Amino acid sequence: MNLRILRKKIKSIANVKKITRAMQLVSAVKMKKAQQEAIETIPYRTFLEKIILKSMSQVDKAHSPLLSSKTNNNKYLYIVISSNKGLCGFFNFSIFKFINNQIDLKNSEFIVLGKKAANFISKIGGKIIADFSTINFNNAVSPIFTESLKKFLIGDYEMVFLIYNHFISATKFETIKTQLLPTTISYIKKVETKEKINEYLIEPDPKTVIDEVLKNLIEEKIRGAIIESQAAEHSARMLAMKNATDNAGEIIYNLTLLRNKVRQEKITNELLDMVSAKISVESN
């Protein structure tokens, strides 16, 4: 192999390594920020569920349309959260695999947040009723909540679910499906709490208060899912870029050995030519 070509390849891969290393560091910083935001949303969401739990003794499901479905048409709405960009390992593939294996497209419609999910669902023939991929993810909470709530209340869907990558740690995430409507209390169960559930004095009336608290809870669940998904995305990208950086270093090492070998062979051949020429001159 040509020595000049080898040098160009080594230089090119070294530049790629610098880029992947920088992307790895940037993703690590973004992941820590998103992780902190995800942690900070949990206490408020938990507090809302405590209020609902302690008020349930005075509230019947009939008090709020958010607590029960108006239809039994077996039609479901899925809010799918993916990423707009690639280079994040199997982050998006995990979402695609889950949808492909777990979701019946005939009885399902989708609200998507993320271009990758929008492209995949369109390719497999899923029906997308709203796509919020072009706006800032944090600004998409309110329109997603409004659209899904409106469709649920008019009886278009029996249930509404969230599908997203739940952030577990810096090296691990899991694709999960969470029920959004009808609302369920997932963080706190009555049998798990040792607190005495006192009756609240609810004013002006249980229906008005519970409706507003439930709406806040649903909106916070959407916001929490988006933040967790972003943390998982940055985590996956950080790991992908780390692997790319390590692979680039290994390739550079192997190419450097090959370059040294080629250069040594070239020097050896030149010496042989010189010796052969000297012997030829002396024999003549």
Regions found by a protein language model. Give the residues of each.
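C-terminal beta-strand-loop-alpha-helix "lid" module of Rossmann-like NAD(P)-dependent dehydrogenases
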Residues: 1-284
